[in-house]
């Protein structure tokens, strides 16, 4: 019997939104977590497992932390099916990390709020509300400067839209200089998607009708670019 050693920000009811996001992503795409990132981690990981070859999966599992996590998984869940083994590897590594165990993806030092797995493009959540926005924007700038494949997805919650750094990140990602001053072949905005999980609450306050004034997060794109940042409002329980 084990007890959990710290706070946990769960994502009950938001799982379908994460699956819809991860469905089209691959390992070259990078995701930064929202405040409730457990289902984001699992969805992105499962999407990668489905798309990678058995050889790529085995190489990833065997090389990660010198194979220690894989060895722990094989003690109780060995199977000849590589994709099934990879699924168990993902689940075990994530849960062990959340429970601060040494066999977690980062020796349990990240915990619930900072679980991540870089080989699948899964970057950490942030304990600061909206904290992923400027970090993800910096990652997108790195991708653009270094001609890297893939897009960066910044997952944030509706309450983060009350945080100044989030708007700064959105503005930075779409600066006119990317279109007017950058060299040919690199012109255009940063390769980033700002995905807002709107569950109508931020801590104890309702963002719609109480603590915010936008009513719908998708409207905010109109204040950033003439194209409204290509903003769309998607039904989170039916994202596909």
Locate predicted features.
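Short beta-alpha junction loops
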Residues: 198-200
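Cofactor-binding active-site loop characterized by glycine-rich and histidine/acidic residues
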Residues: 2-192, 203-228
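Cell-envelope and extracellular/periplasmic
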Residues: 195
